[in-house]
Amino acid sequence: MSSNPFHLFGSPSRNDSVVVKDEILSVQHLVKKYGDLTAVNDISFSVKKKSLFAFLGQNGAGKSTTINIITSILSKDSGKIYLDGYDQDHYSDLIKSEIGIVFQNSVLDPLLSPIDNLEIRAGFYGLRGAFKKERIQKLIDMLGLQSFLKRPVGKLSGGQKRRVDIARAMVHDPKLLILDEPTTGLDPQTRISVWNLVNDLREKTGMTVFLTTHYMEEAEKATYAVVMDKGNIIAQGTPTQLKNQYSGDYVLVYGKNNEDWENQFLLQGRKFTYNHDSNYYRILVKNSIDAIDFIDRNKNLLTDFEVVKGSMDDVFLNLTGVRNMEEGK
């Protein structure tokens, strides 16, 4: 798969019959059961190379189980997994060498410095000598670790730890980087800085990122998204496709509750709700063009309005009945 010296498992032949040119990961009819409980129920999806793939679902949806199977932490009951055409059933160690993972809870040794953590991890993957030093230095520069490189990890801020977590996951130059709730527990400004970093890494390295998150605004940035619920895939597509299918734009019309307004909305076949606290109607529209038409038709009724685009939060609510996911899984 790669000529880098820290890929220790040679270059076995892959099954070109299952290789799709622009796919890095293919999951086919995956099943995992725990007794009578089906944690993952015959799911199939693929991840394109160089993409940001979002894997979404509330607690117990099957996300963690699926990731643990992809990374060979758990065995599957049936199904196939291919990474860049290599069958996990035959090349599990090779596939593991091509995946990096940032866990929700940091696995860094808090008593050691970032440089010590990176050197230990690099040694685990067989990096030695000048190549090891060069790879670690590249990560230090790329992720901006220099200013706290020798400070104990336990004394770093949340954002600094996340940078080191990402460096650790990338030390072996993986083709697929899994980010499992990477910004949970971070303040909004730090979350933004982490995502700026991830986007910068994708641009510089061409690496594919597989994301799980309960922050729906992060899923908005994905190339493609899969939504899980109770072990099943209940929707998948680009964020735009999902919003068009499972959400919608809406117009906020401000003013006091007015029966004449409501009669007009009903005559036009509009779905609406009224917010008593903020005194506005929320009228569902198909898209921005429909919003403009609605505003034009009702301009004599309106004192003020606001057009709001449908969001991934709306998609998630409509699919699962849950406004947002709890932290964790």
Q: Predicted segment positions?
A:
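Catalytic Walker B motif of ABC-type/P-loop ATPase nucleotide-binding domains
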Residues: L177-D180
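Conserved ABC transporter NBD signature motif
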Residues: G79-D87, I95
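Conserved catalytic motifs of ABC-family nucleotide-binding domains
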Residues: D173
